[in-house]
Amino acid sequence: MVSLSIIARKLFGSARESRIKRLRQKALQISALEEHFQKLSDGELCQKTDEFRQRLTDGETIDSLLPEAFATVREAAKRVYNMRPFDVQLIGGMVLHNRGIAEMRTGEGKTLMATLPVYLNALEGKGVHVVTVNDYLANRDAETMGKIYSFLGLTTGVILHDLDTNARRAAYACDITYATNNELGFDYLRDNMTFDRSQMVQRGHHYAIIDEVDSILIDEARTPLIISGPLEDRTDFYNLVNTFIPNLTPEDYEIDEKQKTTTFTEIGTEKIEKMLEQAGHLKNDSLYDIENVAIVHHVNNALKAHKLFVRDKDYIVRNGEIVIIDEFTGRMMPGRRYSEGLHQALEAKEHVAIQPENQTLASITFQNYFRMYEKLSGMTGTATTEAEEFSNIYGLEVVEIPTNLPVQRLDEDDEIYRTTEEKYRAIVRDIRQAHEKGQPILVGTTSIEKSEQLAERLRKEGITDFKVLNARYHEQEAYIVAQAGVPGALTIATNMAGRGTDIQLGGNIEMRIRQELQDIPEGSERTAKIEKIKQDVQKLKEKSLAAGGLYVLATERHESRRIDNQLRGRSGRQGDPGRSKFFLSLQDDLMRIFGSDRMDSILQKLGLKENEAIIHPWINKALEKAQKKVEARNFEIRKNLLKYDDVMNDQRKVIFEQRMEIMNAENLTDMMIEMRNDVIEDLIETHIPSGTYSEKWNAKALQSELSQCFNLELPIEEWVKEDGIAEQQILERILDAVTKFENERTEHYSPEMMVYFHKAILLKTIDMLWREHLINLDHLRSVIGFRGYAQRDPLNEYKTEAFELFQTMLKNLRRDVVSKLMSFEIVQHPLESTMPQEMYAEHSTSRNIDKKDGILWAQMQNNTEVSDPIKRDPGDSSTWEKVGRNELCPCGSSKKYKHCHGSFIPKMDG
């Protein structure tokens, strides 16, 4: 019986078809304007930008400008690059403008498509961020697409890793800014650690288009960006613990590859305890005693480093450093470090220099960073499989954009073998057959180790003319990938290495021009050579087409269908022919970890002989089912982690907003008085609570705490002996005494100086306590899961206790600020010595990776100038009024004023 949904779909079409139909109608409206825009001069076309901006000022909406704005960009692209965006690119541009994700096949022109909504939204003048996965793509796209924006009178900036603060600020001030997700996140964190608004570089989060959105918002969703500072050096202990692991046997530990965890068995725990005891590091006989918490952490990391992390698969050793390999792309991630001591454990394992651990100063995940944008959209070749996650987490709808030309790629059924050895024999055989007829081949592997194993097999078989593209040769990545479509080219690549670079049959013209003609200046010779390259590429393309187009051969299935689809999508761009096939074995990680027992028994019943493969659609469906299970599990993990991170994110917003208020404030006296009064009221409530008899009051403790906190001795014990005195009277006396004491201390300083002191005290105290709070939250997060054993919801427990920790932090903040305010001294201090603080930007995957990002200097500049009168008392600075910065200081020190009393910082006790 045919379901009603199928009947309805046949009658009315699917929701996607209806949406695309509506967008096509709008694309036709844009195309109808084309003839008019073709008649405009370059100046008139450029003038459209000012016209659109004026219309926005006059009350028109950005949506009403869309048809004309898109037509403007289309015409500009034709004039600048002789490239005309197709109607399907107009459709994709509208999806991006409407807060959606445009799923567009490889080679269909995502980069050009993005110029349409980028231009439209840049008209508002609030800044548009185009986000890419690496500096190369950010720089390339800013350079190429920037010419279109410049033609239309808009400015384009690019944020690269090595830019200084001023250059970053200038790039963010542009109408359009290209940057990587890492740089955007780190700049946000740095901005919220500055001491002055003028030191910030970003100007808000208005609209962002994320290229390769699945990579950033799905694959790296659990990746916190971390700003950290160094902790104490524990190199000797890492090396000691590292010597324990080789003495263990398989019965001493358990490995869960599915969950990626390692644990000691009871026998293993006893062995470790004995080794620690002999080394003099075990307290109270048990490894799991509360005093050995830090040791357990080190031992567990050492076990994980040795038994779970594989060299040349998860990381490589290069130039004496551990360099992490991205599990999704196979790329090196230089500068990134595993956090929480894991990276140090790997360094000890590989006997390279151990870098000190870092303390988190500020952090944010990509999930929470990109959800700050008022408007967010993305584009990729593969997003449909993750549509539910994009919708639930980010509120983004995935729209599959139709191709400009029909896809001609043939996706063949998988070939499955019993063993890895049989699989590789078949792969080499298939490569030889395709290679001999001149077909370009892209071989996809899942790790550096496997790509090099295959390369070695090919060499033994006499096939040597191939390129290996993996994390070891990252610098050549784009060029090698760009030429993978040349007839006879054989390229072995780890996963999605080279993503973002098109594989064009015959080779990439632009890449060849850049590579071959970089030293030849503009002129007739260069023009002639460019024409020759174009003719050569066309001939090579015809040969590649005749050989069947690009053949994508995958040596293994990934956990995610999306990654497999990305690899397939490298072939068959823009209607070109091509083919793809996956070669698998029952010993592959996916099959082995996620249950191939049933499949193995079926293959045995079928009487599968050695070197024989089974090819059947049922196998593909079974594999897809396994992948869906893994994807669903990973989605649940990400969703659950986000719930926990949202707790910290809410607190982070409060702290960062408070810092911004303080930096923007012209006078903080009222805030300081309020904090001071809150502290006093808390002390009163603690030691002489309302509604209690005076016999229950603890006057001695109150007097002691007032002395510590306010640097003020008050006769509280005598006051409480007075007949009929109430706690309210004591409160008023304390407030009066504290106010008088504070006024006497500050009357000699100008209002500007006091604002500076208040800001310095507040910001430094907030930052210090926030760092401690982050450590407390990390500790809480690491143990909260055990609450489940007591039949309590760990998430609710975490929310409750995190809130209590936050409340305690705010209480401590008030007390610390007041204490420092009441005890600071004004001392002479040269402006040049402004307390530098060493910090690192880090990038942590699954709360485990850090990214070293250079050294930042957090400096508090005192730009206030104290004035000086005609009659000046050297001992009384209040009589000096205005003093020139280069005049001698009135105090009689014979120093210039700017190097004496003209430069002050607060000296804080405690």
Swiss-Prot record:
Q: Which organism is it from?
A: Bartonella bacilliformis (strain ATCC 35685 / KC583 / Herrer 020/F12,63)
Tell me which residues bind Zn(2+).
Answer: 889, 891, 900-901
The enzyme's main class, written as a single word, is: translocase
This protein's major location comes to membrane
Compartments, record wording: Cell inner membrane; Cytoplasm
Q: What does this protein do?
A: Part of the Sec protein translocase complex. Interacts with the SecYEG preprotein conducting channel. Has a central role in coupling the hydrolysis of ATP to the transfer of proteins into and across the cell membrane, serving both as a receptor for the preprotein-SecB complex and as an ATP-driven molecular motor driving the stepwise translocation of polypeptide chains across the membrane.
For whether the record's keyword set contains Nuclease, the answer is no
Q: Which reaction does it catalyse?
A: ATP + H2O + cellular proteinSide 1 = ADP + phosphate + cellular proteinSide 2
Q: Name one GO cellular component term.
A: cytosol
Q: Report if keyword Transport is assigned.
A: yes
Q: What's the protein here called?
A: Protein translocase subunit SecA
In terms of NCBIfam families, this protein maps to: PRK12904.1, secA
Matching HAMAP family: SecA
InterPro entries cross-referenced by the UniProt entry: Helicase_ATP-bd (IPR014001), Helicase_C-like (IPR001650), P-loop_NTPase (IPR027417), SEC_C_motif (IPR004027), SecA (IPR000185), SecA_DEAD (IPR011115), SecA_motor_DEAD (IPR014018), SecA_preprotein_X-link_dom (IPR011130)
- What EC number is given for this enzyme? 7.4.2.8
Q: Any idea which GO molecular function terms this record carries?
A: ATP binding; metal ion binding; protein-exporting ATPase activity
Q: How is its cofactor bound, per UniProt?
A: May bind 1 zinc ion per subunit.
Q: How does it sit in the membrane?
A: Peripheral membrane protein
**Which PROSITE patterns does the UniProt record give?**
SECA_MOTOR_DEAD
Q: How does it assemble?
A: Monomer and homodimer. Part of the essential Sec protein translocation apparatus which comprises SecA, SecYEG and auxiliary proteins SecDF-YajC and YidC.
Gene Ontology biological process: intracellular protein transmembrane transport; protein import; protein targeting; protein transport by the Sec complex
* Gene3D superfamilies per record: Helical scaffold and wing domains of SecA, P-loop containing nucleotide triphosphate hydrolases, SecA, preprotein cross-linking domain
Positions annotated to bind ATP: 89, 107-111, 502
What lineage, starting at the top, does this entry show? Bacteria, Pseudomonadati, Pseudomonadota, Alphaproteobacteria, Hyphomicrobiales
Q: Which cofactor does it need?
A: Zn(2+)
Q: Which Pfam families match?
A: P-loop_SecA, SEC-C, SecA_DEAD, SecA_PP_bind, SecA_SW
Highest rank taxon of the organism: Bacteria
Query: What family does the database annotate?
Result: Belongs to the SecA family.
